[in-house]
UniProtKB/Swiss-Prot annotation:
Keywords: Cytoplasm, Elongation factor, GTP-binding, Hydrolase, Magnesium, Metal-binding, Nucleotide-binding, Protein biosynthesis
Region described as G3: spans on this chain: 81-84
Source organism superkingdom: Bacteria
Matches recorded under Gene3D superfamilies: P-loop containing nucleotide triphosphate hydrolases, Translation factors
Known role: GTP hydrolase that promotes the GTP-dependent binding of aminoacyl-tRNA to the A-site of ribosomes during protein biosynthesis.
Residue positions binding GTP: 19-26, 81-85, 136-139
Protein's recorded name: Elongation factor Tu
Subcellular location: Cytoplasm
Start and end residues of each stretch annotated as G2: 60-64
GO cellular component: cytosol
Subunit structure: Monomer.
Length: 395
């Protein structure tokens, strides 16, 4: 049978399975593809195919991730599943697989476990905006009251981390039974996907977000002015737009884009993903530098102090061989530049070992354009020793 081409006309959403080891994340992933395959919306993938996830390297960090794709009547999904707990931690912090929503898998037979909590916390920290719950292995629990108890526990845990625990959809099912073709349990997979379709909103397209472009290079063209080059990260910029120059300097400056050039051709506008040169009115060559960003006025501010969730590379990944302590001063690489920063560790954490993940407070020596969810690397003498994501802004 010829493989059907995926319809690209449907809105695209990135999701993933999260939860404690052996609660059934990979089995559920296999079950979703198998059940949807019957409606022609996927290629059925077995447990073994998903579990044998290839290793990938993202910013020098080794991560095993399985990617599957499938579609429902209304949407096209890219779904990530990680074999090991460490892979989830790395994946979520580096944003190797950005998630618009997550399916939290909890075994009804065991209830929430330590990694259930940790994955919910990570989702909160790295900005996974929506979670749908799949209570798995319900075929093994005869007691209806016990199921309700586990559901309440999961809802409370989600609320504890500022997710709307009372409103989140919870579907009770059995991934294994669905995978084996039991119609009663297959219906639960269909129900789960209907909840995911309804509850997880279609993400805003990159081009609909406010304009932002990290400055990679600056040069002046005699008689015309100063050009900043870079790749548009999000949004759209048109000739005549007013933009702000943000970061590294005390004051945020504003200027008008008088020209947009791409591949030596003049354009009226550029959008997310385009590599451009932007001609800026009245900006001297020394008023703008690599590491700053051009952005829609008021859309992003420069900050020097924030909380971040960080994964510290292991020795095997080329990271440090020794732990670091509070007041450690590495470089923080944001978008196109390194800025020195000082680290404070949480109460009761003496040191951080290579291979750990930790929430830390960072104070940079110069402010940069950051928001919740901005990704960065931690570098020491030019080599990457950590990867992080801004969890919250302090000042």
């Amino acid at each position: 049978m010829a493989k059907e081409k995926f319809e690209r006309s449907k809105p695209h959403v990135n999701i993933g399975t999260i939860g404690h080891v052996d609660h059934g994340k990979t089995t559920l992933t296999a079950a979703i593809t198998t059940v949807l395959a019957k409606a022609g919306g996927a290629e059925a993938r077995g447990y073994d195919q998903i579990d044998a996830a290839p290793e990938e390297r993202e910013r020098g960090i080794t991560i095993s991730t399985a990617h599957v794709e499938y579609e429902t009547e209304t949407r096209h999904y890219a779904h990530v599943d990680c074999p090991g707990h460490a892979d989830y931690v790395k994946n979520m912090i580096t944003g190797a697989a950005q998630m618009d929503g997550g399916i939290l898998v909890v075994s009804a037979a065991d209830g929430p476990m330590p990694q259930t909590r940790e994955h919910i916390l990570l989702s909160r920290q790295v900005g996974v905006p929506y979670i749908v719950v799949f209570l798995n292995k319900c075929d093994m629990v005869d007691d209806e009251e016990l199921l309700e108890l586990v559901e309440m526990e999961v809802r409370d845990l989600l609320s504890e981390y500022e997710f709307p625990g009372d409103d989140i959809p919870v579907v009770k099912g059995s991934a294994l039974k669905a995978l084996e073709g039991d119609a009663e349990w297959e219906a639960k997979i269909v129900e789960l996907m209907a909840e995911v379709d309804a509850y997880i909103p279609t993400p805003e397209r990159e081009t609909d977000k406010p304009f932002l472009m990290p400055v990679e290079d600056v040069f002046s063209i005699t008689g015309r002015g100063t050009v900043a080059t870079g790749r548009v990260e999000r949004g759209v910029v048109k000739v005549g737009d007013v933009v702000e120059i943000i970061g590294l300097a005390e004051e945020t400056a504003s200027t008008t884009v008088t020209g947009v050039e791409m591949f030596r051709k003049l354009l009226d506008q550029a959008e997310a993903g385009d590599n451009i040169g932007a001609l800026l009115r009245g900006v001297a060559r020394e008023d703008i530098q690599r590491g700053q960003v051009l952005a829609k006025p008021g859309s992003v501010k420069a900050h020097a102090k924030f909380k971040a969730e960080v994964y510290v590379l292991s020795k095997e990944e080329g990271g440090r061989h020794t732990p670091f302590f509070a007041n450690y001063r590495p470089q923080f690489y944001f978008r196109t530049t390194d800025v020195t920063g000082i680290i404070q560790l949480p109460e009761g954490t003496e040191m951080v070992m290579p291979g750990d993940n930790v929430e830390m407070t960072v104070e940079l020596i110069a402010p940069v354009a950051v928001e919740e969810g901005t990704k960065f690397s931690i570098r020491e003498g030019g080599r990457t020793v950590g990867a992080g994501v801004v969890a919250s802004i302090i000042e």
